Amino acid sequence: MKRKGVGFSLPVTVVMLVIGFIYFASVFTFIDRWFSLTSSPGIANAAAFTALALMCIYNYSIAVFRDPGRVPLNYMPDVEDPESPVHEIKRKGGDLRYCQKCSHFKPPRAHHCRVCKRCVLRMDHHCIWINNCVGHTNYKVFFVFVVYAVTACVYSLVLLVGSLTVEPQDEEEEMGSYLRTIYVISAFLLIPLSIALGVLLGWHIYLILQNKTTIEYHEGVRAMWLAEKGGQVYKHPYDIGAYENLTLILGPNILSWLCPTSRHIGSGVRFRTAFDSIPDSSETKH
């Protein structure tokens, strides 16, 4: 579902400009200088990097424009449902989770976003770089975008370094001030981006393998401390095993893990837990 009221965003504009700059620098400077765009290796690398850039832009656009997941207006928790053994409660008191700002009950894993001013299903965090929340319906495309972005940054760095190893054939091919500027700006962008996005990718791989959101991780730290204090062992209720966790987020078909598909994600108001004996049909629908 497409978001409503999406306007101009400076961070999104910056991201698109950076993607554009890195693409043109990689193809028309690094690849051309290293292989020449008229050679077979040059054409192959240009085609591969172009495909990578297109996947970055496509997944990024979906993450920006797709609604992260709205709580249904008629949502009401069924405390007597035997197939839903886990009901999240407020941190204080024993009432079911109710959003005072939205004036409705919140499903498990949903949280209110102060920026979006509404509750988001399976909210992970609000990301300024996509001007949107990362939630139930756009989490996978956000993750896939990060995968492609890390790959593109590392690929571009390899092309940058490789193109510097080429000895100029004559004085006309010596690097001028224009090329130096491109190389300096590219290195200034690619090195910190590769590190930052690599750390972000590693973090979300860890979360996916545990079937946690960023919010749930921080809540789990406190829950683990309280459990240990009471002589108990805390287990994240939605952790059903590493591979099962992967398939719940990325899909049952390994070949589609890096594609922006989302037909497998279910409604977002109920989730499989470690206490379930039979998988929820909404979560296993292909």
From Swiss-Prot:
Specify the domain of life of the species encoding this protein.
Eukaryota
**UniProt xrefs under PROSITE patterns:** DHHC
Q: Where is the active site?
A: 127 (s-palmitoyl cysteine intermediate)
Q: Name one GO cellular component term.
A: Golgi membrane
**Protein family (similarity comment):** Belongs to the DHHC palmitoyltransferase family.
The domain-related comment in the record is: The DHHC domain is required for palmitoyltransferase activity.
Name of the protein described by the UniProt record: Probable protein S-acyltransferase 16
